[in-house]
Amino acid sequence: MLNRFFTLTSLPPLLVVPFLGPLVERAHRKGLLILCDFGASALCALLLLFPGPPLPFLLAGTMLFHLLSHLFEIASKVLFSELCPPERLSSLNGIKSLLDHGAAVLAPAAGALLFGLCGFRAILLLCALAYGLSALQECFIPYAPRPIQQAEPPRLRAGIRYLLGRRELFSLFLLVMALNFFVANSEEIIFPGILVELYQFPESRYGLAVSASTAGTLLASLFLIRAAHLRPLEHLRALFLVNSALMAALGLAAPLLRSVPKLYFVLFFTFQLLIGWLTACINVPLISYFQTRVPLEQQGRFFALLAFFSGILIPLGISYTGVLADWLGPGAAYACNNLCVIVLVLLVRLPA
């Protein structure tokens, strides 16, 4: 039932995402952020005031919430490139990565604690207040929209032509999509398959092992804030190759080290720490590259296409990897997926 509800509420907004790009380019980006946060606050407040709504209203409200989230993500990336000097984008994106991943670590624990102490209505109240305060502080962002020179209104088809006509940009786009398809499914399929089913580690040890990647990402974000001058984008191919090689090695070692589970746990934790570090050193410069190299008049459509294909390929990758893991085993599936990424990295043209 929950899977059907998730599909019904997430798929329709996702299909609209490509058309949000032209809207973001036409509209006042700061105003869009305020609208999205205010709308999310209003939805939480309505659910708080009218508990137990009929299913059609709950479906419609959840779909609207997903749509607002997609719109906020696209508009915020474009606004970020408008407000920030190009030479500081990498370090500022490092700060954003640090805050995003820090919130991802703390929010579930804080939410579980609040739910246990005060119940679900307290969480709804907190969400309504948080979104409302976010909308309020966004009102004070100093913002003067840059003039966008366009011969005609922004159209989705023109955005697709722009992407296909830029070889380096399209190569990076393909690599991001490959990571979404082959690697983003790890926590849903690969890690439980290896650590829980194959090695039968307890939940506490599983949680510790998986958290190593987040710890590595947080450390890398701190590093990137201060070390943007090192220009990790210039070493992008090597970062991709080492990252995927570590993942493939973890997959290949899984069946080989079953007789020494403690050794595999230490290996998994150490490699995940490095993988989290390398992933941040790839993702943060990539976002900065897109924000500086894609013209402002194309950014809304570009980030909308990026969000759309990511949203499509991640669940497809989960389904594909589930079948592959049933056939080959989770370790071999992990290695196979990352070997595919390595081959693609070697074939495509990356920025020098």
Label each region the model flagged:
Residues 66-74, 184, 276-284:
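Small-residue-rich segments within alpha-helical transmembrane domains of MFS-like 12-TM solute carriers
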Residues 5, 95-103, 175, 305-310:
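Hydrophobic alpha-helical segments of secondary membrane carriers
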Residues 3-8, 14-41, 46, 55-57, ...:
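C-terminal transmembrane bundle of multi-pass solute transporters/carriers
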Residues 65, 80-85, 89-90, 192, ...:
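Helix-terminus/helix-capping segments at the ends of transmembrane helices and short amphipathic helices
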Residues 118-125, 161-221:
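A single, central transmembrane helix in multi-pass transporters
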Residues 55-66, 91-148, 211, 266, ...:
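Hydrophobic alpha-helical transmembrane segments
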Residues 61-66, 176, 180, 268-272, ...:
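Helical-face signature of the major facilitator-like transporter fold
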Residues 73, 104, 108, 179-188, ...:
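Conserved extracellular-gate-facing transmembrane-helix segments in secondary transporters
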